[in-house]
């Protein structure tokens, strides 16, 4: 997801969990 996430396999964003 654009907001970030811990291991979003479907997205291209791998940021911190906000």
Swiss-Prot record:
<keyword id="KW-0964">Secreted</keyword>
<comment type="function">
    <text>Myoactive.</text>
</comment>
<dbReference type="GO" id="GO:0005576">
    <property type="term" value="C:extracellular region"/>
</dbReference>
<comment type="similarity">
    <text>Belongs to the pyrokinin family.</text>
</comment>
<keyword id="KW-0027">Amidation</keyword>
<dbReference type="GO" id="GO:0007218">
    <property type="term" value="P:neuropeptide signaling pathway"/>
</dbReference>
<dbReference type="InterPro" id="IPR001484">
    <property type="entry name" value="Pyrokinin_CS"/>
</dbReference>
<keyword id="KW-0527">Neuropeptide</keyword>
<dbReference type="GO" id="GO:0005184">
    <property type="term" value="F:neuropeptide hormone activity"/>
</dbReference>
<protein>
    <recommendedName>
        <fullName>Pyrokinin-5</fullName>
    </recommendedName>
</protein>
<feature type="modified residue" description="Leucine amide">
    <location>
        <position position="18"/>
    </location>
</feature>
């Amino acid at each position: 997801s654009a907001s970030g996430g811990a291991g979003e396999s479907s997205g291209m964003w791998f940021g911190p969990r906000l």
